[in-house]
Amino acid sequence: MISGVGALIGRLVWNSQQVDPARSASLAYQNAVTAVSEGKPDSIPAAEKFAAENKNTYGALASLDLAQQFVDKNELEKAAAQLQQGLADTSDENLKAVINLRLARVQVQLTQADAALKTLDTIKGEGWAAIVADLRGEALLSKGDKQGARSAWEAGVKSDVTPALSEMMQMKINNLSI
């Protein structure tokens, strides 16, 4: 009986040690993101510090939020750096795909089409095929490769794509003819 109670107490202590760091990271992430979205002074440096110190999913998510702030301010180099940091902080393949998609968009805006194409090559999974095709078309078009862009968008239209994205890619194909 006593050993059973001891084991139960030990298990509860161990569980609390595992849950408490996750809770505090979650709370710190929420506070950082809220402060940034509210435009509080010094919130961006604090969020950057949080992202740099948390080499986990919360750090990666903070990097995504920061990258959006930098894109909104047209600070694209800073956005790209945050996205690269976010990639290093997560092992989740879907989160990596989202980060890589955003990174490729930023790279296209920075006229780094070759880097964007390499970034897009790292995204795996059929669920991402249409979005990757759309961005691939944008990157190729920015390099002046109209035929490559057309091929990418045509492949995107043929993939399992939402009607809205399909129509948008079809409009891009049609605009190449003009």
Label each residue range with its predicted role.
Residues 22-42:
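Short extracytoplasmic/periplasmic juxtamembrane "stem" segments immediately C-terminal to an N-terminal membrane anchor
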Residues 42-43, 78, 115, 148:
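Alpha-helical positions within canonical tetratricopeptide repeat
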Residues 36-37, 48-52, 59-131, 136-139:
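Alpha-helical adaptor scaffolds
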Residues 19-23, 57, 94, 127, ...:
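Residue signature of alpha-solenoid helical repeat architecture, marking inter-repeat boundaries
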Residues 142, 146-178:
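Terminal, low-structured helical/coil segments at or just beyond the last alpha-helical repeat
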Residues 12-24, 51-55:
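TPR-adjacent "capping" and linker segments in tetratricopeptide-repeat scaffold/adaptor proteins
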Residues 1-17:
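Single-pass alpha-helical transmembrane signal-anchor segments
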